[in-house]
């Protein structure tokens, strides 16, 4: 936990993530248990920026759950919580994005990593989502559905919440 803040935005490697997400997503680890262990760690070794950021990420996870309780099906509309028109969708461009054949080396490497491993760092998830939405003009819902089909740590609440945020169609319209 002490190093988490310094490594949390890494793109690849073994140290860029807590590796909790597959366990949390499958229900094999509860957020409550993770939090209890985090507090025990802090009691023994002291709090740090890293342990704070782990706690903060657990809060984001809960925040996305509360969004679903409040807004329900609205979160799945093309406009999300906003009033924007439905995004365009170019099936050919979306297919290239899914296969990692966009011509953008970092985006392509990230998408091929996802296909090969079922995992991608949080920072790369944000990057490829932004690329689909802002550079390709793609439909954020198609990207969210692709992540649902590919991620080993898929969590409906976090996935939908993050895609809405990046698309500027959630509670923060800036995206």
List the predicted regions and their residue ranges.
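Catalytic cores of enzymes that engage adenine nucleotides and/or redox cofactors via long glycine-rich
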Residues: 1-117, 146-153, 157-174
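Conserved helix-adjacent loop modules within structured domains
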Residues: 117-119, 140
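Short glycine/threonine-rich loop-to-helix capping motif typified by GTGT followed
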Residues: 134-143
